[in-house]
Amino acid sequence: MHANEMRECAHDDLVEHVQNIVDKFCDERITEDRIRQWRISRGVPEAEYRAFYESELGKYCLPPMAGGFDGPFIARAALVARLMRRAGATMPYLTDMNSMALLSTMRILSQQEIAEDLMSCNGRVAFSQAFSEGGQGESGSVTTEVTVDEGGIFLDGVKTFVANGQYIPRTLVYTRDMVNGTADGGVSLWLVPIDEPGVSTFPLNTVGQEMLAPARIEFEHVKLNPDWQIQTEGKLSQMLERQYELGRILICASSLGLAQAAMDDVLERCATHVSHGRNLGGIPQIQQKVADMAVRVRAMDMLVTRAAESISNGADADQQHLDCALMKYYVPKAATEVASEALQIFGGVGYTDDARVGRIWRDCRGNQIAQGTDEIMPHTVAKMLIKNCASRLVDF
């Protein structure tokens, strides 16, 4: 057996193990009534976080230096997909997974310092990510700014769509910084406590993904402690590029799980529901929709697995970029289409809270925007494919 085949077998066993422990946790902790309540309350109770971190699942949201899982990234993608499938909703543990992904891109000393600080704070290595700004599509056009005067270092600006921004004690702020960020082209990262004077948080009433509790955070001349700056040593651009790829895998794994949940609900309804004296699953038009949905779900699974394995196996950087871009271009949109067809098959009840498919559609739709919109992915895909072709022609 070749090395790649051995890795694939090992990954298959690991994925199956992760899926089993997710199923066990969901059987014990997650019900449809609880999901509905948590959506209304914009998050899960603290007791549920404790239960998650005390279970075997908790180690997948922790870095190795904090006792977390030290293995291929595909295991974390499998966890996200299975959890979203079982819940039929976007669970807030996704924020913790994104924190872990971003932390893994930092230098080891920074990882250790941040992990120790956060673990002592609330037992979780989690921070919100204050990167997005209203109307600012490119990170290079960020307007949040760090300034320095005789009184110290100060932060001013507004960030939006900060997942769990009101509830996680620290937020990682991406900002213009012409003094401390010169090595990175005038930008820097700061891990800021949200209870500091001058920090204000406000809820965002999004149409989906309620348990992520998105927020707007305003920084009004917040005095910064120099120790809060993340030391990037001129490698911030590479760090963020890596984080985007890991984050996109997690987002697409979430989309995959949501689409699988919609498919599960459709198959059950087709097998049990009778319409005008006919079994729903026996109607040719419904069969066509089910077949189309199955193809999309299968393709999504393949793309997510390919991208996650590319990262896990340490493929060359260009291959990782291509696999992640192809995945992000296709998966979120396909998930939304699957959920939309599920809603159509359910009919009127699908447009109410009596069925999960409506909220699944709303959650899927948000993932077409998160971690890079659908529209920007073709640029990366085409560029990488043409580059690979040009390289082969030169070698030939």
Walk through the language-model features, giving the residues of each.
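Glycine-rich phosphate/cofactor-binding loops in nucleotide/flavin-utilizing enzymes
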Residues: 2-7, 79, 346-396
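Glycine-rich beta->alpha junctions and the first turn(s) of the following alpha-helix
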Residues: 7-9, 201-298, 325, 367, ...
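C-terminal helix-coil-helix/basic helical segment that borders enzyme active sites and/or dimer interfaces
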Residues: 33-40, 271-278, 297-330, 343-348
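Internal helix-loop-helix
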Residues: 54-124, 163-170, 311, 362
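A short, Trp-centered hydrophobic/proline-enriched beta-strand micro-motif
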Residues: 123-132, 173
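A structural signal for short hydrophobic beta-strand segments in well-ordered beta-sheet cores
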Residues: 144-147
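A short core secondary-structure module
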Residues: 156-202
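Glycine-rich phosphate/pyrophosphate-binding beta-alpha loops
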Residues: 160-165, 246-248, 366-373
